[in-house]
């Protein structure tokens, strides 16, 4: 899993981009975490609790995305994922959800989160 962090020089907004199959992680970092160091620390604390068996799993529901942490993996998905459709799609058509959900190992997620935290601290 590769990622890159940038800061928009005009708006000051922090941006995260992740490699294919993990794009939604970039959206979650950018839109749900942003530069909020307290929220970043909260997620890191929950990861430690899971790693030390003080907690089995944890979920953080955001405005647009939800983070689920378990012993072996992290999952980020759009809150709209899995909602029932009010209308029937034609037989050959389907909704594209691949960029609305991503899984990665808990340690990889923790490393990306620590990198994001460092990037934010240096940019503030």
From Swiss-Prot:
Superkingdom of source: Bacteria
Pfam families named in the record: UPF0231
InterPro entries referenced in this protein's UniProt entry, alphabetically: UPF0231
Similarity section: Belongs to the UPF0231 family.
NCBIfam families per UniProt: PRK05248.3-2
Protein name from the UniProt record: UPF0231 protein Sbal223_3655
